[in-house]
């Protein structure tokens, strides 16, 4: 039954795509870029943040897009009021469960990648490291990795100065082998260990966003670019709306230097920014039906492992 379900979910995927995935997973350094959609139904999208949207509308801001609205808001008092509302509302959603179906799909995907990287022969120790660049504030990825017993390293604001894991890869002293190591980079900040978000630990969208990144998170942003510019690197983009111009610019520059990018498309109508169109390999939803893209990628990687 499981094989039949997998066949139904990725039956429209071409053999050419499977072979290309087999090639990159066998030798390339793997990185991920996660946006809000990676959490599926486990955590609300911004469109469900009714209190924040109301606070924005009351202050004359367009509540349909917080990124755009605050990027064009020069009034610091308004920005801070919206930020405080957002933080309070965000913390009201912190009681998510790791056994949510969408998070089980994410767990399955991360485990599948760990397995295929572990089994791949002739890998340089550095390629045993899997980079996870996330724009999300939550600790869902970290909690899943830790709960699954997968070796990981988390880079948050407190570790962003002079303590980057460029050369850290796990090693099994019994088997004398390097093991898959996930390095999670929190590009826009993070909740604390208790899932609590505070305004001082996030880079909130706004006019000073680039400045905030440069002052608090610039090393993390530059680390992302450095990793993606390395030879034989592949990036899997999941749940990302392509709304961050700085991140898009990094990806575009890296593609020009040889980066291979796979984008898991959630809906057929979802599109790439013009500079990236034609340079990114799109994996569409089979049959045009939206489904957790983590599930799609997990099944693809598992199938590649059986080829």
Locations of regions flagged by a protein language model:
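Conserved catalytic-core helix/loop/strand module for nucleotide-ribose chemistry
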Residues: 1-229, 234, 240-243, 250-307
């Amino acid at each position: 039954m499981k094989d039949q379900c997998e066949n139904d979910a990725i039956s429209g995927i071409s053999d050419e795509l499977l072979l290309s995935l087999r090639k990159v997973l066998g030798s390339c350094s793997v990185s991920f870029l996660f946006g809000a959609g990676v959490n599926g139904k486990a955590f609300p999208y911004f469109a469900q943040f009714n209190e924040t949207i109301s606070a924005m509308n009351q202050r004359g801001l367009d509540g349909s897009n917080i990124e755009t609205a605050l990027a064009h808001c020069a009034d610091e008092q308004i920005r801070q009021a919206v930020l405080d509302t957002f933080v309070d509302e965000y913390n009201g959603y912190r009681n998510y469960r790791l056994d949510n179906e969408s998070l089980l799909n994410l767990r399955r995907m991360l485990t599948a990648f760990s397995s295929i990287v572990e089994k791949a022969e002739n890998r340089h120790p550095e390629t045993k490291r899997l980079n996870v660049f996330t724009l999300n504030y939550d600790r869902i990825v970290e909690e899943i990795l830790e709960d699954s017993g997968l070796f990981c390293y988390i880079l948050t604001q407190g570790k962003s100065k002079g303590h980057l894991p460029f050369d850290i890869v796990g090693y099994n002293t019994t088997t004398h082998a390097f093991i898959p190591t996930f390095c999670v980079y929190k590009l826009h900040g993070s909740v604390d260990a208790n899932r609590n978000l505070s305004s001082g630990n996030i880079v909130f969208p706004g006019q000073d966003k680039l400045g905030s990144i440069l002052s608090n998170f610039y090393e993390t942003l530059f680390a992302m670019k450095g990793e993606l510019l390395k030879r034989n690197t592949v990036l899997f983009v999941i749940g990302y709306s392509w709304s961050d111009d700085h991140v898009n610019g990094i990806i575009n520059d890296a593609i020009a230097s040889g980066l291979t990018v796979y984008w898991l498309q959630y809906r057929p109508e979802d599109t790439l920014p013009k500079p990236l169109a034609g340079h990114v390999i799109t994996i569409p939803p089979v049959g045009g039906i939206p489904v957790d893209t983590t599930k799609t990628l997990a099944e693809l990687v598992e199938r590649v492992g059986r080829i």
